């Protein structure tokens, strides 16, 4: 097949070609991260969520908070549903002995596929809104715009947090369904556009920003009247209303937003207005820096990574503010001469403003994943700048420059994927870029504790104490190290302090429950185990709580707990033994014998089971 034949085939099947190219390049560039472990928020949000692994709970996810705790104020049920499906597939195809790296692979493969589809939709939207002209030189120029934006978006290293980090799927899905909503909107299928908008909102709250983009396309690009555009977009009130109702059902009093953010997650929330605005523009500068030169990437920017701006003459504030003003000018005053640039400015500003902390503080000060949607607008602006260079210099130089950028982005992305290999790798890399990050310090210390590297853990604690002592995580780590040194009084003091700072600190609850159980203070242990399973119903702690209730001669509570959290399927040697023990203490020897015998058949040969079985038989 000659070159002319290939070109002819691609020309006649261009969208299919771009879709295949998107999938191939996405796996080529992000594929080296597929077999990374669950890291950071992946562990609590995805890996250890029992409600995501239970098929009978699937539809309940659509009225459940993103985290177990309503007060966190997050509602992303469609994203949770896709995690659940990943778990179901893992259970069906992977052996029980599979490693966490193997279990995580399917989740990341899905993320890569969604990113490929998103990149394809970027190509489609740019091509649709700014199609090639009939004149061959102009046609080449306009094709360049869509291909350049597509390739820059697909390869940009700032997207590793959204693609390689499993919890980044919320960004990916919100972007996907938002662009699908735009597709059906321009095709005048309002019903499917509304459904797509609802799916986008159910993926992540930031999808609300697609509404001004839809309005802009109808009003400015298609030149409909303001009144006609308003009437056309008002129909989207229905999917928004459905979303609000479901969100209220899931979050109750917290449906308007987060109530748990501390100074550690977002210091901006605790600054006065002028300092918050100035520092927020500094953060915009930092985003801009990473979009232009994505070398210094970090998984965490929380306290005390970003110092507050003390003066409006601070260069980082000035650059961020000037960039913001430029985008606003381009959007409102540049659209007559630079329609492409104006659209790029809108696509950056609409999602950015929702996470910028300029309008109101959000749950975090900064996160690279939050740039997933805004980066489309920025990269469209970059492509537009290169596009304009066609008028100034030989196009071969423009193509060479674009090729160099894409190669650089691709290599940097592949290198960055390796940082997410496992928890130690990730937090070590994070602290190299953000040495004052309290969250990263605590996370690395937790890895040290898991690996019995106690000297290193204590070193991280001492650094953390100098950053910010009055933090729940810091106090919890202090208690863990004290307990390791057999100073149980200090351990108890620090874990209680951790809970004073954050009553929902599940790790401190677990540690106190374990301490009290070890000391024989079973009633107090039971209180904390109950708090744990109310928020974090992992089988291990359900069993611990139930055995605590049995030891307190409260078998009915143990049986109720087993039925509520573990269901009727007790086809597990430890769970059936637990049920048998509860019925034995209750004096229901028939039920006790049934479950104890089942436990033995499943392989639990503990001598206590045999003893209880003999007593049960003697009482029948």
For every predicted segment, state its role.
Residues 2-487, 500, 504-511:
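Polytopic membrane enzymes that build or remodel cell-surface glycoconjugates and lipids
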Residues 2-10, 424-620:
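C-terminal luminal/periplasmic domains and tails of membrane-associated envelope-modifying transferases
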């Amino acid at each position: 097949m000659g070159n002319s034949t290939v070109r002819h085939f691609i020309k006649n099947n261009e969208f299919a070609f771009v879709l295949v190219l998107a999938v191939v390049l996405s796996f080529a560039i992000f594929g080296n991260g597929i077999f990374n472990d669950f890291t950071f928020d992946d562990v609590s949000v995805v890996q250890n969520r029992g409600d995501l692994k239970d098929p009978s709970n699937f539809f309940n996810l659509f009225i459940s908070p993103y985290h177990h705790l309503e007060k966190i104020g997050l509602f992303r049920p469609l994203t949770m549903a896709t995690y659940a499906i990943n778990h179901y597939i893992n259970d069906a195809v992977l052996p029980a002995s599979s490693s966490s790296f193997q279990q995580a692979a399917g989740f990341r493969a899905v993320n890569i596929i969604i990113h490929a589809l998103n990149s394809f939709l970027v190509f489609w939207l740019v091509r649709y809104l700014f199609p090639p002209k009939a004149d061959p030189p102009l046609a080449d120029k306009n094709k360049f715009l869509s291909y350049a934006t597509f390739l820059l978006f697909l390869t940009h290293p700032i997207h590793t947090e959204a693609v390689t980090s499993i919890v980044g799927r919320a960004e990916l899905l919100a972007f996907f369904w938002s662009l699908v909503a735009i597709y059906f909107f321009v095709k005048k299928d309002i019903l499917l556009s509304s459904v797509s908008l609802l799916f986008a909102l159910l993926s992540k709250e930031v999808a609300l920003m697609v509404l001004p983009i839809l309005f802009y396309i109808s009003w400015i690009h298609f030149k409909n009247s303001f009144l006609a555009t308003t009437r056309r977009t008002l129909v989207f009130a229905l999917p928004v209303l459905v979303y609000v109702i479901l969100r209220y059902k899931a979050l109750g009093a917290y449906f308007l937003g987060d109530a748990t953010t501390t100074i550690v997650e977002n210091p901006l929330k605790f600054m006065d207005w002028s300092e918050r605005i100035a520092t927020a523009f500094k953060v915009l500068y930092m985003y801009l820096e990473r979009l232009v030169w994505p070398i210094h990437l970090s998984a965490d920017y929380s306290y005390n990574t970003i110092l507050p701006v003390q003066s409006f003459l601070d260069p980082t504030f000035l650059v961020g503010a000037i960039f913001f003003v430029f985008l606003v000018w381009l959007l409102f005053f540049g659209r007559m001469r630079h329609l492409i640039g104006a659209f790029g400015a809108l696509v950056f500003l609409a999602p950015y403003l929702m996470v910028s902390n300029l309008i109101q503080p959000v749950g975090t000060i900064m996160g690279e994943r939050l740039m997933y949607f805004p980066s489309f607008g920025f990269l469209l602006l970059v492509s537009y700048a290169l596009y304009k260079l066609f008028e100034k210099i030989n196009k071969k130089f423009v193509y060479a420059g674009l090729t160099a950028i894409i190669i650089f982005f691709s290599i940097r992305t592949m290198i960055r994927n390796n940082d997410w290999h496992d928890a130690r790798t990730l937090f070590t890399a994070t602290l190299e870029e953000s040495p004052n990050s309290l969250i990263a310090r605590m996370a690395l210390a937790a890895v040290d504790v898991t690996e019995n590297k106690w000297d290193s853990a204590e070193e991280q604690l001492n650094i953390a104490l100098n950053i910010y002592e009055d933090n729940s995580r810091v106090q919890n780590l202090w208690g863990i190290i004290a307990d390791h040194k057999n100073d149980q009084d200090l351990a108890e003091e620090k874990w209680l302090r951790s809970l004073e700072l954050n009553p929902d600190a599940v790790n401190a609850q677990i540690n106190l429950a374990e301490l009290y159980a070890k000391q024989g203070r079973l009633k107090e242990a039971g209180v904390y185990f109950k708090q744990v399973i109310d928020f974090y119903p992992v089988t291990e702690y359900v069993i611990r709580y139930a055995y605590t209730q049995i030891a307190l001669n409260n078998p009915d509570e143990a049986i109720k707990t087993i039925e509520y959290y573990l269901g009727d399927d007790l086809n597990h040697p430890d769970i059936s033994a637990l049920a048998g023990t509860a019925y034995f203490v209750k004096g229901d020897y028939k039920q006790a014998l049934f479950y104890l015998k089942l436990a033995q058949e499943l392989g639990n040969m503990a001598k206590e089971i045999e003893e209880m079985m003999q007593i049960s038989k003697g009482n029948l």
